[in-house]
């Protein structure tokens, strides 16, 4: 029983680490291009996009852990690693697509349309590569995947909410739109970077 609690504790600790201190967007820049495209896009729900990305990252983590451990002894495992993890993302995406088609809920059409955009994302593949290059255990990988997904959800919500406020007339016209969004993301990234204990040299 204590081993199970210890494993859950490790997974939770890594989830919190990935959510706040190692946020995929603000500390590593993973998925920023997709995040910027989401701001102001009325066709794609930011909430559902981030939720699908979170589920995808959580499901890919154990699959990539087991698949990655199978190629360790191969001579070119470093070159095969990204392809293998991309295949893991594809398998999870196909699985999620099949589930969404089988359920046929009121939002199934929307979720099926958003799924490829959310699953095939540098945030998902980058998180898996971080997990495997750092040699995380299974519990650490699952926790980090969940935390990274929740961190992406947090970042999407922060930037989407800011997008509504960044349309102010007080902002000079040259900075409206993409420039002010990038400045806002940069300031948030510096705040997270400072939160992790790094000093910012200006």
Where does each model-flagged region fall?
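Juxtamembrane boundary at the C-terminal end of a transmembrane helix
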Residues: 6, 190-202
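Structural signature of hydrophobic alpha-helical transmembrane segments
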Residues: 10-26, 77-91, 142-155
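Juxtamembrane transmembrane-helix termini in multi-pass membrane transport proteins
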Residues: 14-55
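Generic transmembrane alpha-helix signature in multi-pass membrane proteins
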Residues: 29-35, 99-102, 114, 122-135
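Small-residue-rich segments of transmembrane alpha-helices in multi-pass membrane proteins
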Residues: 52-61, 113-129, 177-189
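Ordered, amphipathic secondary-structure segments that act as subunit-interaction surfaces
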Residues: 66-112
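Transmembrane alpha-helical segments of integral membrane proteins
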Residues: 153-169
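Interfacial loop-to-transmembrane junctions
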Residues: 164-183
